[in-house]
């Protein structure tokens, strides 16, 4: 059984639930757990109930309760001898973000409000963001992955050049990088870790939504390790609160404007913001606070009050605004949901 689960002991209505002994269930008739007394017109059943540690939940079609049968096998009425699994909880930070001021310099995340936020360092020590979506996979942008790589670079070329941190500067090893097939139109890539990361209050994935949360006016939170108001990379995770903007206004804002292209190496994704049906904009041009260089790859996190769960409505793709009256551009999570699930299942 996984060390994320445990077996608990309960004596309830004459039914004995087996003793908790870590990952091993003791013989119920040994000296550590004596046989219960018999009752008239009744009998004793030996039952175990599987439970998960904090920040994990039981995944099973049954109820997690197993009975010892005559063949001395633990079975569940619904799933037989198939054991349940403990899967990581997503989108349930212990200390969720408060409704605070929007600041480019950022509000310090001292409480672990964004446990899905990862820090990625690419070639030549450039800091960018990534977003944990389960225990072993993260989303980031194709632009981030191609930083300081030539347009001919492959995913295999890129993976060894990246350094990734989760939680409080916890270094994790990267197994592979997977680029979205049409990354010139949908600026997204996936990162697979060599090992699953233990989930706790500092490290927790954000949930991917089944519906589109990128509605005009909806407020989301974006955390990151990008440049601050002095254009220096920060050593502390910061966050900003931004509203989803009208797409027409955003497109109109960027019409005719360009971002200087780097001469070498040239990225196959390009430097300009990608605006299409798979993206949305956030930020309002009358404000002078926003995301900045190095924040790309971070989630536009929204709080569903009914479910009390945080979802990634999008992933920040274009982060060049830096408080100069421009919009940030995000890839919609709903546009990549099927690809993400398929890629994870195949790898």
UniProtKB/Swiss-Prot annotation:
What is the annotated tissue distribution of the protein whose record heads this document? Expressed by the liver and secreted in plasma.
Signal: is it a keyword of this entry? yes
Q: Which domain of life is it from?
A: Eukaryota
Entry GO CC = blood microparticle
**Compartmental location:** Secreted
Q: Which UniProt keywords apply?
A: Acute phase, Antibiotic, Antimicrobial, Antioxidant, Disulfide bond, Glycoprotein, Hemoglobin-binding, Immunity, Secreted, Serine protease homolog, Signal, Sushi
Q: Has UniProt tagged this entry with the keyword Signal?
A: yes
Glycosites: 125, 148, 152, 182, 232
Please classify the protein's predominant subcellular localization into one broad category: secreted
The residue ranges of the Sushi domain are 31-88
Family to which the UniProt record says this protein belongs:
Belongs to the peptidase S1 family.
User: What's said on domains?
Assistant: The beta chain mediates most of the interactions with both subunits of hemoglobin, while the alpha chain forms the homodimeric interface.
Q: Which organism is it from?
A: Papio hamadryas (Hamadryas baboon)
Instruction: Identify this protein by name.
Output: Haptoglobin
Region spans: Interaction with CD163: 259-264
Which Cys pairs are S-S linked? 52-86, 90-207, 250-281, 292-322
Question: Quaternary form?
Answer: Tetramer of two alpha and two beta chains; disulfide-linked. The hemoglobin/haptoglobin complex is composed of a haptoglobin dimer bound to two hemoglobin alpha-beta dimers. Interacts with CD163. Interacts with ERGIC3.
Q: Where is this region: Serine protease?
A: 103-347
Q: Which PROSITE patterns match?
A: SUSHI, TRYPSIN_DOM
**Role description:** As a result of hemolysis, hemoglobin is found to accumulate in the kidney and is secreted in the urine. Haptoglobin captures, and combines with free plasma hemoglobin to allow hepatic recycling of heme iron and to prevent kidney damage. Haptoglobin also acts as an antioxidant, has antibacterial activity and plays a role in modulating many aspects of the acute phase response. Hemoglobin/haptoglobin complexes are rapidly cleared by the macrophage CD163 scavenger receptor expressed on the surface of liver Kupfer cells through an endocytic lysosomal degradation pathway.
Please state the span of the N-terminal signal peptide per the UniProt entry: 1-18
Q: Which GO terms describe its molecular function?
A: antioxidant activity; hemoglobin binding
**Biological processes, Gene Ontology terms:** acute-phase response; defense response to bacterium; immune system process
